[in-house]
Amino acid sequence: MDQEEFKRYLGKMQALCSRGEKCRADIRMKLEKTDVPQDVITQILNKLESEGFIDEHRYAGAYVRDKFRLQGWGPVKIANMLKVKKIPDRVISRALLEIGENSVLETLKDSLIKKAASVKESDPVKRRAKLTRFALSKGYTYAQIYQVLKQLQ
């Protein structure tokens, strides 16, 4: 691959990163789809990182805020999705600190109240099981779910 082609791919990736936060895994996947050689992908990723176009800490923080506030995901689901994107555990932990335990419980409570209104089950045990499964699928822990369900009774 010549220098001109490298600059073309670099420019495309810079434009992509300028539109929204991206992580190394996102850019790598995009470049691999276009059959860019691995050594060139590594060079492009390093260049983007050194120029501040990609930053794992910034990406993880934005991802946590978006998924928590907009989609109501819990910390477990957010952490798992960030791990899929190969974000280091220490970066994930630091990003998850941005959402406090109180706001996690409040969001879970709001989600469970909404869900409880749509659950038609009259048996309290089955109703509680449905709400628990729902909250687990959203990425909350058993302890958080138990705590909130206890408040709601």
Residues covered by each model-derived region:
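An alpha-helical, amphipathic repeat domain used for nucleic-acid recognition
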Residues: 1-153
